Amino acid sequence: MMRLIQQITLLLRISAAPNTVHEYIGGTPAKIVKVLNMLDDMRDDIVAIGVRHKIVVNAYAEAIRERFPDRPLFVVTGSTTTLAARRKLRKTLRESKNGILLCTQQSLPSSVNFEFVDNVIIPELHYNNSRMSQFYMRFIRYNSTREKNIYFVTYLGSIESNQMQMVLAKEKLNLFMRGQDTDLDDIYERFGVDYDLLSVLMSREMDENGKMYIKWGEQNIV
C-alpha cells in the first residue's frame, strides 16, 4: 500500500511540473506551455496562478520570465513574504495593469483580498474544493463587479482526471451534508466539465496472472 501511495504522489508531482524531477530530459512541459498560452491570451489582464508546492512555483516562474520578460511577475510563498508585504503587494499588483501573481494557494491569508483580479489559473489541484476555494475566493468578493474566470488546468486521461473526479464527488457529498441534494451532472456544469470524465479515469486492475496494472480509462492497449 505504501508503494502505491508513493507512486500516486510521484504521478501527481509529475503532472504538476515534470521538469522538477531530476530524471526529466524533455523541453517545457505541455501543461506549462498551456498556461503560458493562456497568459498570452490574457496579456492585458491581471492574472493569478495558484499551485501547491514551492518547487512548482519556481518552475512556473522560470518559464514565465523567459516567455514574458517585460511583464510584471509577483511571486509569493508562505515563507518568503510577510503579511505587511502581501498587503503592499495588493496595491502594486493592481497598478501593474497586466501583472502576474504566482503563488502557493496557501500563501494568501484571508485578510488580504484581490477582488480586482478576474482570471485565476489553478494548474495543481488539492484533494477537495474547500482547500482550493480558500485560494480562489480571495478573488471572488462581495464587492466584485465583474465575472470571474477560474481555470483548472489538468491532463486529460491522467491521474489528474481521477483527482478531479474525486474533487467533484467530494463537493457533491459536502453539499448533501449541508442539505443540498445536488446531482453530479449539476456539479460538472458548475465546474465547467463538458466532457465524459468517467471514461478517462485510471483504475487498478489485475491480469490473468494476478499482477496489478493500471488501466487508463476505457482505452484498450494491444
Regions found by a protein language model. Name each.
Residues 74, 121, 151-153:
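Hydrophobic/aromatic beta-strand patches that form the interior of the parallel beta-sheet core
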Residues 16-20, 53-57, 80-81, 107-109, ...:
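Short, solvent-exposed loop/turn segments at secondary-structure junctions
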Residues 10-11, 35, 49, 102, ...:
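Generic structural signal for small/hydrophobic residues in well-ordered secondary structure
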Residues 48-50, 58-59, 68-108:
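Conserved helicase ATPase core of P-loop NTP-dependent helicases/translocases
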Residues 127-136, 140-221:
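A conserved SF2-helicase RecA2
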